[in-house]
Regions:
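Secondary-structure transition/capping motifs at alpha-helix termini
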Residues: 70-78, 99-109, 133, 137-142, ...
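Residue patterns forming the tRNA-binding/recognition surfaces of aminoacyl-tRNA synthetases
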Residues: 5, 10, 19, 23-27, ...
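Short, solvent-exposed turn/loop segments enriched in Gly/Ser/Thr/Pro and often Arg
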Residues: 36-38, 46-47, 80-93, 147-155, ...
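Alpha-helical support elements that line or immediately flank enzyme active sites
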Residues: 58-60, 285-290, 499-507, 640
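Protease-associated
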Residues: 214-279, 283-289
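Feature 926 captures the class I aminoacyl-tRNA synthetase adenylation module centered on the KMSKS loop
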Residues: 205, 398-458, 462, 506-549, ...
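Non-catalytic terminal extensions that flank enzyme cores
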Residues: 1-56, 73, 79, 338, ...
Length: 885
């Protein structure tokens, strides 16, 4: 090794990251080509929206994938990570509409469909790559040469093929039924695009007069009085004896005075409200189903804009919630309002804009799901596709067993326009894989295409195979489909995972992925979801700019367990930054002491420390590889951390220093250099998937075999180097050194002062301790070490500690000034007791507890507990010193 291999004193992530990412891309290390006979490993990226900006969820999700990809690349697999992004129909349309309104004061309707769609494409070209470039800042190693877009030519062709194929099989149909409607986004939504939130509202109890029976009423309870004008019946349970005589009678609708029947239906819950419910088939999904069963008329009283229709009579033209207020006022005036109760219930909100969803009867396109789900459920229950953690299998199968038809049409302009044409002359409806110019039935050119666009998730459901060239049978599909693993959050199992399994089994007749690796959400330090409204979001790019991408990546993964949410703590970011600095400094030290290193030099026999660290390396390689195979990426990262920090840096390097510094003993120095280089190179390889930049920088400076660490070979354990005896002996010595350090700290002894020690050692450890007592002297600050038999004479007036097979004694003579140390501790105790009294006073103050924020009270309690613990420790130390006087 020469001077050029030295690395700077301080690690600068920004310059290192830019340099190596450009190097990797230039050398096309991310790129994959089909290679028959070579083991494939493939992942398709969950495509981020083109409107997207990198957030912590993206950072976690993509780092998990990158670790798996980099690991398998080093394992020698033919590794493809297919990147791309999603057109995000509704989200993108809303974004461009906002820009249009702000910059030009126009709406999409002012531009017209064709011009507006052109504007969206222009916006996509300008901003679409933003999140891709942000992912590159994170170190993501996708095959960017294969970047796809859900509306590119190939994906659009796949969407057309899928739609027409399902249409021809009768699995896509156009129907009129009740759907979720967003009055703000002006489009239908599928069931899973509606977020149900527990909301504190009211139950209004309203009495409906019985026709022909004076002073006889049937009282109902409703959460939506604004829909009363759309009532076409009142329902009771046929088993409810309270209302048996009223079944079949007629009621008069309050305010509008229209007559409606009393019907019996077992769906009615006798315990809800009064046990009698109003039925509004056009504005409630359950009422709609009941209306079909009883052939009830459907009266639409709320329009698609959330405004009351003409059918609402005197309330026409009112916004739906203003109508609610006025109807309640009229009910009071007419003496029909019995009472109002507070009532908590789940209210559906649009996932995109968060407005309250309105159930409305409309004509939409649907996919029949029941004929498609069996194959998608079977492939999971028989183990062809496995969820990790396994508990999510139940979530998936449970939802699939109760699935409803999928509403796939959206009343928007940006997206895959539904490939159906209508003939204005003969009325024929035709689905086509290519754009039609004339009616296939009558030949008329008077045709028009359906105005609606497909749900964004329709194209996303085809992602694992549309990105690889389907419907053509490409070489890419042959090599890389089914993909190896899908990495995604539990929040889109139903939106995306289920639909990919359905489409994969239907069109490829094969699973889309072998494993589904589920992770949780990244929450703030208080466990809250990060959001704009709370102002608690943390920008990953800011973390990268300040601490480096490696720090963010390693912190996210080691703080994560499969399937569970994690909390973001700045303290953990700083802790990981310290780990990066530790690695850097250790590597810098090693390189500074590699002068004259020759890998072919004659070596001296391995020392105990050499044997131990090489054995521990093999153990770590096996542990990390096994954990990665089980998708326990956080545990694997922590195992690497412990090995590098707690074993290589804290112990081996410190023990190796005398040999590295001694240029006179060439063979011994060469051996220490060889072992340290071997261990560091292997450690960097293990760490590379997690921290790709710093490991590449260090690898390039160390003796190495590949032109880049990312295409080097993953370490394989060498069983000939596994040495349990060396590990046992070294553990005994390390435990002894820790005991010495703890005893010195306990009495506040000068850490730089050399002291004598006596060790009583068991027969089976005596030889190893005797031959390696230099380690104890070096790291324990011992100048004279006396070894005795374990059952031999125990020294008096000495501190003692017991570890496995060894008793360690430190004679007190000259170790500390007992009187001086006692005085110091007395002052420390008095100050802490004063602070404890102050904290206790606050916690016993009712006013403080009533007025102070919860986090302030929690901090005060934590302070009180911490002080109590410290006081107890000081008292014990003083009691111990008192015994020594």
């Amino acid at each position: 090794m020469t001077e050029e291999h030295n690395i700077p004193k301080v690690y600068d992530p920004a310059s290192v990251e830019k340099k190596w990412y450009e190097f990797w891309e230039k050398n096309r290390y991310f790129h994959a080509e089909p290679e028959p006979g070579k083991k494939p490993f493939s992942i398709v990226i969950p495509p981020p929206n083109i409107t997207g900006k990198l957030h912590m969820g993206h950072a976690l999700d993509n780092t998990l994938q990158d670790i798996l990809i980099r690991w398998h690349r080093m394992m020698g697999d033919n590794t493809l990570w297919m990147p791309g992004y999603d057109h995000a129909g509704l989200a993108t349309q809303i974004k461009v509409e906002e820009v249009l309104k702000k910059e030009e004061g126009k709406t999409r309707f002012d531009l017209g469909r064709e011009e507006f769609v052109k504007r969206v494409w222009a916006w996509k070209e300008e901003y679409g790559d933003r999140i891709i470039n942000q992912l590159k800042c994170l170190g993501i190693s996708c095959d960017w040469e294969r970047k796809r877009f859900t509306m590119d030519e190939g994906c659009s062709r796949a969407v057309r093929e899928t739609f027409v194929s399902l249409f021809e099989k009768g699995l896509i149909y156009k129907g009129t039924r009740i759907t979720n409607w967003c009055v703000n986004c002006h489009t239908a939504l599928s069931d899973i695009e509606v977020e149900h939130e527990d909301t504190l509202g009211h139950l209004w109890y309203v009495r409906y007069p019985v026709v022909g029976e004076e002073d006889t009423y049937l009282t109902i309870a409703t959460t939506r009085p604004e829909t009363i004008p759309g009532d076409t019946a009142v329902a009771v349970n046929p088993e409810d004896e309270r209302y048996a005589k009223l079944i079949g009678k007629t009621l008069r609708l309050p305010i509008l005075n229209r007559e409606i029947p009393v019907i019996a239906d077992s769906y009615v819950d006798t315990k809800f409200g009064t046990g009698a419910v109003k039925i509004t088939p056009s504005h409630d999904p359950n009422d709609y189903e009941m209306g079909l069963r009883h052939n009830l008329p459907e009266i639409v009283v709320i329009g698609k804009d959330g405004v009351m229709t003409e059918e609402a009579g005197p309330f026409a033209g009112l916004e739906r919630y203003e109508c609610r207020k006025q109807i309640v006022a009229r009910l009071k005036e007419e003496g029909c309002l019995v009472k109002i109760e507070e009532h908590s219930h789940a209210v559906g909100h649009c996932q995109r804009c968060h407005n309250i969803v309105e159930p409305l009867v409309s004509t939409q396109w649907f996919v029949k799901m029941q004929p498609l789900v069996k194959a998608a459920v079977d492939c999971v229950t028989d183990g062809r596709t496995q969820f990790v953690p396994e508990r999510f299998t139940k979530n998936y199968t449970g939802w699939m067993e109760n699935i409803h038809d999928w509403c796939i049409s959206r009343q928007i302009w940006w997206g895959h326009r539904i490939p159906v044409w209508y003939c204005d002359d003969c009325g024929e409806m035709s689905a086509s894989r290519t754009d039609l110019e004339k009616c296939p039935k009558c030949g008329s050119t008077h045709i028009h295409q359906d105005e609606d666009a497909l749900d964004t998730w329709f194209s996303s459901a085809l992602w694992p195979f549309s990105t690889m060239g389907w419907p053509d049978n490409t070489e890419l599909l042959k090599q890389f489909y089914p993909t190896s693993v899908l990495v995604t959050g539990y929040d889109i199992i139903f939106f995306w995972v289920a639909r990919m399994l359905i489409m994969g089994m239907e069109f490829m007749k094969e699973i889309p992925f072998e494993k589904v690796f589920i992770h949780g959400l990244v929450r703030d330090s208080q466990g809250r979801k990060m959001s704009k409204s709370l102002g608690n979001g943390i920008d990953p790019l800011e973390v990268i700019e300040k601490y480096g991408a490696d720090t963010l990546r390693f912190m996210l993964i080691t703080g994560n367990t499969p399937g569970n949410d994690m909390r973001f703590y700045w303290e953990r970011v700083e802790g990981t930054r310290n780990f990066a600095n530790k690695i850097w400094n250790a590597s810098r030290f090693a390189l500074m002491n590699m002068e004259g290193y020759d890998k072919d030099a004659e070596l001296a026999p391995y020392t105990l420390a050499d044997k131990w660290i090489l054995s521990r390396l093999q153990d770590t390689v096996k542990d990390v590889t096994g954990l990665l195979e089980r998708f326990e990426l956080g545990e694997a990262g922590r195992a690497i951390y412990d090995f590098i920090w707690s074993e290589v840096c804290d112990w081996y390097i410190e023990i190796a220093k005398p040999r590295l510094y001694n240029k006179e003993a060439a063979a011994e120095r060469a051996t220490a250099q060889h072992v340290l280089a071997t261990v560091l190179v292997s450690a960097m390889k293990l760490l590379h998937p997690y921290m790709p930049f710093i490991t590449e920088e260090i690898y390039q400076c160390l003796p190495h075999e590949a032109e880049s660490i990312m295409i080097s070979k993953w370490p394989v354990a060498d069983e000939s180097l596994v040495d349990p005896e060396a590990e046992r002996g070294m553990n005994a010595i390390m435990d002894s050194i820790k005991a010495i350090r703890n005893m010195r700290a306990e009495v506040n002894a000068n850490p730089g002062k050399k002291i004598p020690a006596i060790m009583l050692v068991s027969e089976d450890l005596r030889e190893v301790v005797a031959h390696n007592d230099s380690y104890i002297k070096l790291l324990g600050g011992i100048d004279n070490l006396e070894l005795r038999q374990l059952n031999g004479e125990k020294p008096e007036n000495a501190m003692a500690a017991v570890v496995t097979g060894i008793e360690v004694y430190l004679p007190l003579a000259g170790l500390i000034d007992v009187e001086k140390e006692t005085q110091r501790l007395s002052k420390e105790l008095a100050a802490m007791e004063k602070d404890l009294q102050r904290a206790g006073g606050k916690l016993n103050n009712a006013g403080f507890l009533a007025k102070a924020p919860e986090d302030v009270i929690a901090k005060e309690r934590a302070k009180y507990e911490e002080l109590s613990g410290k006081i107890e420790a000081v008292k014990k130390r003083m009691a111990y010193l008192a015994e020594l006087k």
